[in-house]
Amino acid sequence: RNQVWLYRLGTLEAHVAVNYPFTGFHDTRLCYVGQGWQFQRQTDITPPGENGSTVRHLDMQQPADLLQADMWLSVFDEQGAPQKFPSEDFVKRVSDRLVGRWLQQEQEADTTVVLQVLCVEPGDSMEARDACAGLLAAARQSLSRTLSQSPQPR
């Protein structure tokens, strides 16, 4: 399922989407590649005050429509706990799995929910980037709270 909301602040336009449920990790980038988007840069960021979870930031462009966008992705488990994006490095991914099995660390969430914040044509304005970051923070908090208060299937 997919739920999308559109927010506007002056000339800035942002789409907030919640996609669910996915079994394990869903690579949302594949959906955008299929729509002609290209990724210029990707950064995984640990939000302040959080341990072990990451937010993925993507600089994107769509040459056919001459569009530029910033997208932030955040993944949650069914209980609303933010998750960490898997490593992009194949060797690190394999070693993390082996070490995780050896140490019997917590496994990846079985079911995940993906939050997307897509800011189209944000430009280089710090105000626009701050507005998108604020929208992301509020959306993450709201989704986490909603999921944590939802009845869990037994």
Task: State where each predicted segment sits.
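Short, solvent-exposed recognition patches
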Residues: 1-105
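Surface-exposed amphipathic alpha-helical segments
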Residues: 110-154
